[in-house]
Amino acid sequence: MAGHSKWANTKHRKAAQDAKRGKIFTKIIRELVTAARLGGGDPGANPRLRAAIDKALSNNMTRDTLNRAIARGVGGDEDNNMETIIYEGYGPGGTAVMVECLSDNRNRTVSEVRHAFTKTGGNLGTDGSVSYLFTKKGVISYAPGLEEDAVMDAALEAGADDIVVYDDGAIDVFTAWESLGAVKDALDATGLVAEGAEVSLIPSTKAELDAETAPKLLRLIDMLEDSDDVQEVYHNGEISDEVAATL
């Protein structure tokens, strides 16, 4: 299955991610603690925890750090009042945007999220306003350079749902989100080395952005990700190579 450039992937990743490494680690640790608190410390029986572990390792977090976070969650000593909140809204260019948060203060979080939407010309929606456009999936990503047929055969044998090969040669393998850990283990066993693995919300439709709306969407994502309460931002915006070259 052919795909567009990685620039137009489901989630925008900042090029200067290293500058936000500390904040990224803080958010991953918060998710590890919460997942372990809610579902226990065994990743084999806790898909949410397994997904958080895969994400932590993809971001080069040490085993010691993630194990301490899991122990905190199982012990129930910290972050025991954190709750997952999903906000939905419309961004620039009619894009559908989903914002996944972990928060101990709903009023603070919704205020920050609403402010980001308002400042970039979007608006915060009600529950169900755009969520029907997204499906929760596991995503295992591979860097360019692998043989497409080899990845496809291994992925299908492992129980994957779909494979997308992008113009730059990168490959994403999609799974049921609950099966992410098992499928990744099976692919690892074949010798394929994944660049990353995570649970994501995949849009069923795309909204094409132009030179005016694309920068506004990227600003919205930046503002949302700057919030300590925001864990993930998903959207259905698509930026063509031509528009991307002007940014």
Curated annotation (Swiss-Prot):
Keywords: Cytoplasm, DNA-binding, Transcription, Transcription regulation
Keyword Cytoplasm found: yes
GO CC list: cytosol
Compartments (UniProt record): Cytoplasm
InterPro entries (UniProt xref): Integrase-like_N, TACO1_YebC-like_2nd/3rd_dom, TACO1_YebC_N, Transcrip_reg_TACO1-like, Transcrip_reg_TACO1-like_dom3, YebC-like
GO biological process: regulation of DNA-templated transcription
Family: Belongs to the TACO1 family.
Record protein name field: Probable transcriptional regulatory protein YE2395
